[in-house]
């Protein structure tokens, strides 16, 4: 059996969210297709339509925007048929650039929260695990006048691969990386850095025994699991603060609803540094991105 780690990133613009997060969720290959089918069914149950048919997609910024919470938590609470009909009308209004109506916004907000809740239910049901790194906003920028080497994989990436490798090694199973494509030239540079890491460093060569060194890039609007990964890392950035170093601003409505879900899904296991074993976790904060660790 193999495990696929579906990854996305948020906060790389260093503006909107308190943490630059990279990562997502790992799922066994045998569970992937049942999971995708269940997400499709959930989408139809919530919205009464496929969002892709209306030039939209599942994203954390869309499902869990502040106005989605505001609209989704107000009365009236619609029954399924009414909610679905209003959601389809709202999506069609978006295509036709019509102003949204209050009832449609309420229904769409309820559907969005139901979708986000259901995603975490399905991740648990299909025994997925969360692996992610969080860099405080602003720390992702190198020190002025001291640009990092362009061919070196960033510390947060290596920590993410490290935790995924610990998990795979414990299972004695292989892992594949599936990533959201961003910009072709930047993706090529990342692949080269990844290649150098796995070929030219001792840790990388060892971890290539468990992680296939060549990542797969997919368009998120055509890959539902990558869209789910986007929801996971958006929630993590705004609502997960159980790591000691994560003290950034929080959206309480997200934290209260989802922090315990993230904590339940994060990987817990053991790592090994060549001398001893120690407890390790799938989520790690990296506040010292460009500083050496003692």
Show the residue positions of the predicted features.
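Phosphate-ester processing/binding pockets and catalytic centers
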Residues: 1-294
